[in-house]
């Protein structure tokens, strides 16, 4: 499998598609497809904040990559008519970096921190007073000359996004008034996203083609958009005016994306679990080592979708393959073996 195949189902953004994602992003809640429960709740919170002429409460968005956390943050800013400043946990290395960002904010602005779980502890602690009471105290100087400088801040909204909510400290997590767990998208929503994206691309797609794309996109909008771009290439070269189910199937087979959206890494994981560990239980570190990945990649990029479609289970003793996984791989299943 070459590098391109490995990237095709990566739910994290690829460098050369970041600009194209901007053209696909909805601007307002009414345009945002999926995550209905979250949208319904946000609609109430946004309306109430605007009626009171207050900044929206701080928001934590968590869930697997590619589900639209950054997009939703931008939508929230648009709905509030607020300016948004975007950064990431790894980009804020020192407390001074954070203070500089906070000092640029005006009343009602939004600060979006992606990968907020990767903030250094010292930086995170500065956020506590900023979020709760809208001020920061910074100690300058050393020894007898050390003194604190008090920086009042305007009311602002912090939106944090993370794929690893469990890695957030309790004090930080508790300061978010709005917490939204973003779920994998059902096929019906992904089909709508595929149709919307095709329209933006001025590309014709049949309902059957959109449905097949949706089924093989791992419940992830970013992936359905990426696959649509690749399938569009195959259709164009083949001289097809409309993307139908057959074109999608032929293209994705060539890209090593199977009927359930699994790639070679997923299949290697399942085959290792079934053949080498007799279906499990097996520890994630052992599985990751056997398939040549690190455990963080396996936990963040491989296992969430396999759990979602019911191909594996997490147990106190480790990962286990389910009967559905055996059936998908066409391996005889024996009760009690896994």
UniProtKB/Swiss-Prot annotation:
Cellular component annotations (GO), alphabetically ordered: cytoplasm; Holliday junction resolvase complex
Pfam families (alphabetical): AAA_lid_4, RuvB_C, RuvB_N
Alphabetical GO biological process terms: DNA recombination; DNA repair
Residue stretches in coiled coil: none
Highest taxon of source: Bacteria
Residues holding ATP: 24-25, 66, 69-71, 132-134, 175, 185, 222
EC number per UniProt: 3.6.4.-
InterPro entries on file: AAA+_ATPase, AAA_lid_4, DNA_helicase_Holl-junc_RuvB, P-loop_NTPase, RuvB-like_N, RuvB_C, WH-like_DNA-bd_sf, WH_DNA-bd_sf
Annotated keywords: ATP-binding, Cytoplasm, DNA damage, DNA recombination, DNA repair, DNA-binding, Hydrolase, Nucleotide-binding
Protein residues bound to Mg(2+): 70
Localization per record: Cytoplasm
Keyword Thylakoid set for record: no
GO molecular function, one term: ATP binding
Residue segments, region Large ATPase domain (RuvB-L): 4-185
Chain residues that bind DNA: 314, 319
Location of region: Small ATPAse domain (RuvB-S): 186-256
Reaction catalysed by this enzyme: ATP + H2O = ADP + phosphate + H(+)
Primary localization: cytoplasm
Region feature (Head domain (RuvB-H)): 259-338
Subunit record text: Homohexamer. Forms an RuvA(8)-RuvB(12)-Holliday junction (HJ) complex. HJ DNA is sandwiched between 2 RuvA tetramers; dsDNA enters through RuvA and exits via RuvB. An RuvB hexamer assembles on each DNA strand where it exits the tetramer. Each RuvB hexamer is contacted by two RuvA subunits (via domain III) on 2 adjacent RuvB subunits; this complex drives branch migration. In the full resolvosome a probable DNA-RuvA(4)-RuvB(12)-RuvC(2) complex forms which resolves the HJ.
Function: The RuvA-RuvB-RuvC complex processes Holliday junction (HJ) DNA during genetic recombination and DNA repair, while the RuvA-RuvB complex plays an important role in the rescue of blocked DNA replication forks via replication fork reversal (RFR). RuvA specifically binds to HJ cruciform DNA, conferring on it an open structure. The RuvB hexamer acts as an ATP-dependent pump, pulling dsDNA into and through the RuvAB complex. RuvB forms 2 homohexamers on either side of HJ DNA bound by 1 or 2 RuvA tetramers; 4 subunits per hexamer contact DNA at a time.
NCBIfam families xref list: PRK00080.1, ruvB
Family under the similarity heading: Belongs to the RuvB family.
Domain remark from Swiss-Prot or TrEMBL: Has 3 domains, the large (RuvB-L) and small ATPase (RuvB-S) domains and the C-terminal head (RuvB-H) domain. The head domain binds DNA, while the ATPase domains jointly bind ATP, ADP or are empty depending on the state of the subunit in the translocation cycle. During a single DNA translocation step the structure of each domain remains the same, but their relative positions change.
Name recorded for this polypeptide: Holliday junction branch migration complex subunit RuvB
Species lineage: Bacteria, Bacillati, Bacillota, Bacilli, Lactobacillales
